[in-house]
């Protein structure tokens, strides 16, 4: 009771979304809110029974841990197939997909709410228009042990329900084979993740190209700071897009991982295996009671073992492969756009560096000119100082002494200019000055 009061008080005082809320979107498009705080062991165990997921998968979808990982730019992207569920963790698209429903954490988060609305709209559109009872959650249709395994009897009922949903989908499509529920939900998650990353990329491009062009025309502290922020965002978005692309590429390269995503066929396969094993057991009991001959009983058992043990779960992954390839092409195009923008940023940086080098060369040339002028002026001052010594010479007594001063001054100035021009000529011949 105390834990419940604390939770209600915290939820009533802050409008922010609670970290333990989950939205359950069923095959008919309906959504139900389910409070599942991580700190309450009972509710967490209920989620584990409902989805058959280990605790580490639920922790990976924890919004608090995801926010911390996103802030440190190390948030993983993964599509993992488990026994009864598919864990989707692609940037903002985080969900647990079962054969009959989709569980989305933190549905009131403004970044996640569009995903919930899209799931409700798309799944409701794909559902049968005839009124039918919504499929029961996995915890009511299947019994889960401590290790997450499914009991054969409940797996049989789950497989029949999943097969029924598949038939309804085929009837909707007018004879065309419809995608299973988990593929439709996965498609919505992939589309949401790709569109959100594409939207971020387009927004960044609209801000980046004008800022880079302005920087090339005018290098200032404000423009440099804008470009620095744009480059930081570019690195962050490129990392997220690259992780999603790598995950899709990994799935396309691994048929076993793609086979693990076929939840509906997996349930139907488990149901058929259970029926075969049950028939084999009944036939064995009947043979042992009615026939006492070893040869007849052994032959019958061998045939049953061949039926029961032959083959393994290997679904046709063509539909899933086509689905993943379409979004792989889309996310690869987004990555190419980011690569083009990165090249444009690098070209702009090279251009700015060339401009700065040119300015630096001009400053160095100006320093050489000033240093040479200072040297020539020092020489002229030294000559003037020599003539300024108070020593009596015959020039003072000469009648032309009145004209000697301007001639000496003009000679010093002319000599200084000639020496300066000679130094400049030597610099140009040596290639120091342009």
From Swiss-Prot:
Spans traversing the lipid bilayer: 367-387, 405-425
Localization: Membrane
Cross-referenced CDD domains: Mrs2_Mfm1p-like
GO terms of molecular function: magnesium ion transmembrane transporter activity
Protein name: Putative magnesium transporter MRS2-D
Membrane topology, record value: Multi-pass membrane protein
Family membership noted in the UniProt record: Belongs to the CorA metal ion transporter (MIT) (TC 1.A.35.5) family.
One of the protein's GO biological processes: magnesium ion transport
Disordered, as annotated region: 126-171, 279-311
InterPro entries: MRS2-like (IPR039204)
Keywords assigned: Ion transport, Magnesium, Membrane, Transmembrane, Transmembrane helix, Transport
